[in-house]
Amino acid sequence: MMAAGPRTSLLLAFALLCLPWTQVVGAFPAMSLSGLFANAVLRAQHLHQLAADTFKEFERTYIPGGQRYSIQNTQVAFCFSETIPAPTGKNEAQQKSDLELLRISLLLIQSWLGPLQFLSRVFTNSLVFGTSDRVYEKLKDLEEGILALMRELEDGTPRAGQILKQTYDKFDTNMRSDDALLKNYGLLSCFRKDLHKTETYLRVMKCRRFGEASCAF
């Protein structure tokens, strides 16, 4: 049987994951910086896993196996977020300050708010897209968490950061069109990549600040 201590911690973590940031801050006004980072990492992990599962299910359902590799090496799979100075892995992320990583994470998150707002209208079948109506809310929630961390690190006065002049296109609702399928496939691929970057940056910051044993990832 699981010990009472770890089980209680696990239940608390799950409960916090289900709460919006406004409720978390209200319920725990004295939440430590480590607590804010822990919650941000949990939320980013959850969104990244959801993005990965959605991409895999879309690929399995709509994209023939023989076409996947060739498509991933075309312009369809190009993510415009690659044009911003964002680290591509853990080692590069460690060269950036925490505030730089938070600002980049915020840019990545905000670039998806428009396209994902109506995601559930596109994927209405019985795939994993059944949870797509909550993706936008989860993404907004992570945005609030990142802003909360920036306020903590900037003494409550966050500076204006870089604004992306371009965001991703909306998902195409015409799922019977090959062009629409390719477009949506590319968007889901980029969403997965950008959420992986965001999760990596948050984990690097958390591990760098608090030196936990779980830093090996």
UniProtKB/Swiss-Prot annotation:
Pfam families reported in the protein's UniProt record: Hormone_1
Recorded family membership: Belongs to the somatotropin/prolactin family.
Function of the molecule: Plays an important role in growth control. Its major role in stimulating body growth is to stimulate the liver and other tissues to secrete IGF1. It stimulates both the differentiation and proliferation of myoblasts. It also stimulates amino acid uptake and protein synthesis in muscle and other tissues.
Protein name: Somatotropin
Residue numbers bearing the Phosphoserine modification: 132
GO MF entries: growth factor activity; growth hormone receptor binding; hormone activity; metal ion binding
Gene name as annotated: GH1
Native organism: Bos mutus grunniens (Wild yak)
Entry keyword Phosphoprotein: yes
CDD domains in UniProt: somatotropin_like
